[in-house]
Regions:
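Acidic, serine/threonine-rich low-complexity disordered tracts
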Residues: 28-126, 164-263
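Acidic/charged, solvent-exposed loop-and-adjacent secondary-structure segments enriched in E/D, K/R, S/T
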Residues: 131, 135-151
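Bacterial N-terminal signal peptides
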Residues: 11-23
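Bacterial N-terminal signal peptides that target proteins for export
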Residues: 1-13
Length: 263
């Protein structure tokens, strides 16, 4: 049971890469529409694994209230539900603090997955161009991993870039390369706008554009797989559906938008 749920959390993180800012890496035409960026928003998703209701996810975005972190904060909460939760309980929280230009400053993860409990802190320093990664095992009360990684001056975590893509107009047939780091590894990953589709999810029926992020197959992760996201084809560019297709032993993980909260 741990394998699918660990991949679900990674899927949530990876899928948000589609929304990392393209800036000078873009290879297609994508005019910016800054009006699409909300001041505050909450998006709630159902999580399905092998056609079973497996969990819930909530993604929130807001201006950062901390004076030392002028910019934005992104929060992701993931929890297992129903029958899955009885066998393998998951309760994960991810927080990313971003500068006003959306470059990541630091991330904090509290992961409770079955008997596994980990806390991970990553600090990104644009001056030294280093990321400092520290992972603690909360059960054994020791340091599981500590390392330093080279990064570019502006880099993006796999969660925090979500809302920037919604300021762009990346049309089908165009792609972008973006710098991404999880604190352990830094890569340049391709994101491709593929085609327009109309899809139905619990939150309603949406006209969308489907994107693929090429993160598997030894890019950011070694596992073979495909990562897709459907953004609404309108000014809001809501992440309506997220899907990770992995090898047969794990299967397909799908997130579908259930509710949008905005102010």
């Amino acid at each position: 049971m741990p394998g699918p749920w660990l991949d679900t959390r990674h899927a949530l993180a990876l899928v948000i890469l589609l929304c990392i800012p393209a800036q000078s890496f873009q290879t297609g035409s994508a005019a910016q529409n800054t009006g699409a960026l909300p001041a505050k928003e909450g998006l709630e998703y159902s999580v399905e694994w092998r056609l079973i209701d497996a969990g819930k996810a909530k993604l929130t975005w807001s201006a950062n209230a901390q004076p030392s972190h002028a910019g934005w904060q992104v929060n992701l909460h993931l929890e297992s539900t129903g029958l899955i939760s009885k066998f393998y309980k998951v309760n994960d929280d991810y927080v990313a603090n971003l500068a006003s230009d959306l470059c990541v400053q630091d991330t904090h993860v509290n992961a409770h997955e079955g008997s596994r409990q980990r806390e991970t802190l990553v600090h990104y320093d644009p001056e030294s161009r280093k990321a400092n990664y520290l992972e603690r095992d909360l059960v054994k009360r020791n340091v599981a991993l500590a390392k330093e990684t080279d990064i570019p001056r502006c880099v993006h975590d796999v969660i925090g870039g979500l809302f920037f893509l919604r300021t762009l107009n990346l049309e089908p047939g165009h792609s972008t390369e973006v710098p991404v780091s999880d604190g352990k590894k830094t890569v340049s990953a391709k994101v491709e706008a593929q085609r327009r589709e109309e899809i139905k999810v619990p939150a309603g029926t949406f006209k969308t554009i489907r994107y693929e992020a090429f993160l598997f197959n030894n890019v950011l992760y070694r596992r073979d797989g495909h990562l897709y996201v459907w953004l609404s084809d309108d000014r809001r560019k809501l992440p309506v559906r997220i899907q990770v297709r992995l090898q047969f032993a794990i299967g397909t993980i799908t997130l579908q938008l259930e509710k949008e909260e905005k102010t």
